[in-house]
Each structure stands twice: as structure tokens, then as C-alpha cells.
Regions:
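Short, glycine/polar-rich helix-capping loops at beta-to-alpha or helix-loop-helix junctions
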Residues: 168-180
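Glycine-centered short loops/turns at secondary-structure junctions
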Residues: 42-43, 137, 163
């Protein structure tokens, strides 16, 4: 089965389980396509949100940086390099490292966050991190139940200015985040 058919099957199953998602089925597929393209091109995902959405950001990153449902092995070329550098340690690393989809949560930097809140404009903390970490072709995922969280909106604008793609995960049909 080709990837597109598999994706559609998964999306249909998702909508079957959660019928409220029917109206955003095309958006889910578009978000997948953005992420697939970014990862295929060696890019990364930056994720931010507030409160419960911050927890979601951390969880998403955790699942991408290690196996989720299926094992993701590291590439054989990396295994060869590991063993060449140090046979014993390289073998342990080769046996236990997991393939990762590069992702960074912007909510888990207490030193930067508190310094920025003390010395700069607190609402710009995610935008500052996007500015420092983001590169053209990367993806910014802003999670906001309302879709109107100012710090997430500023980060989306910063992301667009640097050539990142922006995905908004919101709970509201109409919101400010959808314009980015």
C-alpha cells in the first residue's frame, strides 16, 4: 500500500474515533505533508504552547525523539561509524539508540525563560527561541486552545519571517493563529 493510501486510512480511522475532526480532515493531511517534507529534507520541528498545551508540546517532542509505536532503528552508516570510533561503546550505542525525528520543545528551557522574562519582553519568549533555533524549511507547531495566545502568535510571525512553515493546533474554528 502506498504511503498516501496508508495516511488516508489512518486519518479515516481518526475521524471515525473522533467525529468532531471531520471538518479539519484536510488540515490534518496538510499538516502531515508539511512535516513529511520537512523531515525528508533534514529539517526539524519546534513546538510551543501554554499550560496544558505546554505539556502536549513536551509529549509530542518525546514521541518524535524516540520510538512511538514502531521501532525506529538508526542507519547502518551511523552504526558503522559508532563501532569504528569505539567498538565496545559503539556496539552498545548501536543496540540501544533509536532513530529520531528532530524536534525541540520551546517550553522546557527554565534558565532562558526566566532570564528572558526578567531582562526582555516575556510574551516574546517563544519568538526568541524560534529566532535562534529556526531555519528555513523547519516547522513551527503552535498549540493554543483558543488559537489566540499572544506568545504563540508572536512565535508564528517570527517563524514565517525566517521561512519556517507554521502549523496551528487549536480548539477554535476561527482564531488568529490560522492566518499564519
Amino acid at each position: 500500500m502506498i504511503m498516501e493510501e496508508r495516511l488516508l486510512k489512518h486519518v479515516e480511522l481518526l475521524v471515525e474515533r473522533y467525529p468532531a475532526l471531520e471538518s479539519c480532515k484536510d488540515d490534518i493531511i496538510a499538516a502531515y505533508d508539511l512535516l513529511e517534507e520537512a523531515y525528508r529534507d533534514g529539517r526539524k520541528l519546534l513546538v510551543a504552547g501554554n499550560g496544558g498545551s505546554a505539556s502536549d508540546a513536551e509529549h509530542i517532542v518525546g514521541e518524535l525523539m524516540k520510538e512511538f509505536k514502531l521501532k525506529r532503528k538508526i542507519y547502518s552508516a551511523q552504526i558503522d561509524r559508532l563501532v569504528k570510533i569505539d567498538a565496545e561503546m559503539g556496539t552498545v550505542l548501536a543496540d540501544h539508540l533509536q532513530g529520531s525525528l528532530p524536534a525541540i520543545s520551546l517550553v522546557g528551557e527554565p534558565s532562558l525563560t526566566t532570564a528572558f522574562m526578567n531582562d526582555a519582553v516575556p510574551v516574546l519568549i517563544f519568538a526568541q527561541q524560534v529566532n535562534g533555533l529556526g531555519r528555513a524549511g523547519d516547522v513551527f507547531l503552535g498549540i493554543s486552545t483558543s488559537g489566540n495566545s499572544k506568545n504563540v502568535l508572536y512565535a508564528a510571525v517570527a517563524a514565517k519571517s525566517k521561512g519556517l512553515k507554521v502549523i496551528g493546533l487549536t480548539g477554535q474554528k476561527e482564531n488568529q493563529l490560522e492566518q499564519y
